[in-house]
UniProtKB/Swiss-Prot annotation:
The gene is acdC. It is a multi-pass membrane protein. This is MFS-type transporter acdC. Glycans are attached at N51, N90, N257. GO terms for molecular function: transmembrane transporter activity. Belongs to the major facilitator superfamily. CAR1 family. MFS-type transporter; part of the gene cluster that mediates the biosynthesis of aspcandine, a pyrrolobenzazepine alkaloid. Its main location: membrane. Residues 21-36 have a biased composition (Basic and acidic residues). Residues 1-50 are annotated as: Disordered.
Length: 507
């Protein structure tokens, strides 16, 4: 039984305050005490979601990844339409980054609704309900008569789109065993970061074409409907408590034994419990936990830089290099994309080698082992930032390649940082991630608001240099917690104590 859960972009979907990934373990203590409790018929129960075929599991993984990619794509796609939108509505270009920021703020608040719903009704209902409304809100953006309509609808795009973002990691934990999850989850979360990179590239070409900027929303609607319907056909309900509740209902009808019940029938969370788990306890943990505070600040910087560069790249390439075609000016984002792909390889390779070796030799892996990849790649992000800034007056290819180390750092640091928080807080990881998500999204979402002014006033070189120095200041964090993390955990009331390990690795 593993106490781990995969990393999450905007908050993990919980499992009744138990760790994700535990659902395959039968509740033996309940079975012994009460024969009316409906549970799995052992680990090989054919209805258990982890016993789906590998083909079906990969189909579920890539279906959800496709959905989340288009959700995050929508957050950045309007970043390249600043000038045509501001000209059409006769407003200042300075307000346009708000169209991106409001989506990210929606990403922060949405999981407060979707995560509790996934505990009560399972994964499918909140995922597809939210995704459907997310798609519908593309229509008023596409036909908006004024800027206010765009801004309001963009916020709700984030709120409803966050359903798949927040519930998706729970699905990964439901269907994959801890070892295989180490291969599947990097692909899922890479799709979350791929969307914001593709947004300005595809959006730039659409904006420059005869279709115009409004077709960025129409394209999002069309692709969302296609991949949403595909996922609706492929993705089943995977949340064990709800599946057992459905089994108990079927058995009551078949046997006429009304005494049969499932765990969820008797332990349905209350509104007060949800409020404590997602509001009160996250707030207390954020104030009292040095691990949570430090990693939230670090991950907020990473998240903010990703979205800040949506405004910085147009300054560096469209304005400074006079690339007038917005689609062409967005192609340098491919450098970051290449770096993220390399980051996936780094995580998977280390999972199948170093982590597997530790697990085989020791039977468990300490949470601090997550930080090895962070330590190795922590310098790549500042290298990418310094490189990007001081290559502003060199050949464009030199500046584009700077995105490779930047992409490696963004992906590996973010993913392993989130995994470390989950491993450290285990059964309370939902509260820790809720605190991290709120702070990270609000702090990171504010970066696009000052990005353009910062790069205009300081120049590409010095603006990137300042960000580079800030990221250098964050480099000691994984090193410090790798050395002192066990001692800090020993003093905490919320974390795994010193000496405790975690089960099979799940990066």
């Amino acid at each position: 039984m593993s106490p781990n859960a995969p990393a999450v972009d905007i908050g993990a979907a919980p499992s009744l305050d138990t760790p994700e990934g535990d659902t395959k373990q039968p509740a033996e203590d309940h079975v012994e005490k009460d024969s009316n409790l409906v549970d799995w018929d052992g680990p090989d129960d054919p209805e258990h979601p982890q016993n789906l075929t590998r083909l079906r599991k990969w189909g579920i993984t890539f279906s959800l990844a496709s959905m989340t990619m288009w959700i995050t794509f929508s957050s950045s796609v309007l970043s390249v339409a600043t000038h045509p939108i501001s000209e059409e509505y006769n407003v200042s270009t300075k307000v346009m980054p708000l169209a991106t920021t409001l989506v990210i703020f929606g990403f922060a608040l949405g999981p407060l609704c979707w995560a509790p719903l996934s505990e009560l009704y399972g994964r499918r209902l909140p995922t597809f309900l939210g995704y459907g409304v997310f798609a519908i809100f593309q229509v008023p953006v596409a036909v908006a008569p004024n800027l206010q309509t765009i801004m309001v609808c963009r916020f709700f795009v984030g709120v409803f789109g966050s359903s798949a973002l927040s519930v998706g990691p729970g699905v990964m934990a439901d269907i994959w065993d801890p070892v295989d999850r180490g291969i599947a989850t990097p692909f899922f979360f890479a799709a979350n970061l791929l969307g914001p990179i593709l947004g300005p590239i595809i959006g730039g070409f659409i904006t420059e074409s005869q279709l115009g900027w409004r077709w960025t929303a129409w394209l999002t609607l069309i692709t969302s409907i296609f991949f949403g319907v595909l996922a609706l056909l492929i993705v089943p309900e995977t949340y064990s408590p709800v599946l057992l509740q459905q089994r108990a209902s079927r058995l009551r009808r078949a046997t006429q034994n009304q005494s049969l019940y499932s765990f969820l029938d008797q332990h349905r969370p209350t509104l007060a419990e949800f409020g404590y788990k997602y509001l009160a306890r996250p707030f207390m943990m954020f104030l009292l936990e040095p691990i949570l505070i430090c990693f939230t600040v670090y991950l907020s910087l990473i998240y903010g830089i990703l979205y800040l560069f949506l405004e910085a790249y147009p300054v560096a390439f469209a304005e400074e290099r006079h690339w007038t075609n917005k689609g062409i000016a967005g192609l340098p984002f491919l450098g970051i994309l290449v770096g993220m792909v390399l980051g996936i390889g780094i995580i998977i390779y280390n999972t199948r080698t170093r982590f597997a070796r530790h697990l085989a030799e020791q039977g468990q892996v300490a949470p601090e082992e997550r930080l090895v990849e962070m330590m190795l790649t922590s310098i790549t992000m500042p290298i990418g930032l310094f490189w990007f800034g001081w290559a502003a007056h060199t050949h464009w290819m030199v500046q584009t390649i700077a995105g490779v180390p930047l992409g490696i750092g963004l992906f590996v640091l973010f993913m392993q940082g989130m995994n470390y928080l989950i491993d450290v807080y285990l059964t309370l990881s939902n509260s820790a991630i809720a605190a991290n998500t709120l702070a990270r999204s609000f702090l990171g979402g504010s970066f696009p608001l000052f990005a353009t002014a910062m790069y205009h006033n300081l120049g590409v070189d010095w603006a990137s240099t300042i960000l580079g120095f800030i990221s250098v200041a964050m480099v000691p964090i994984p090193f410090a917690f790798y050395i002192f993390g066990a001692r800090i955990r020993a003093m905490s009331r919320y974390t795994v104590k010193a000496g405790n390990g975690i089960g099979p690795p799940i990066p």
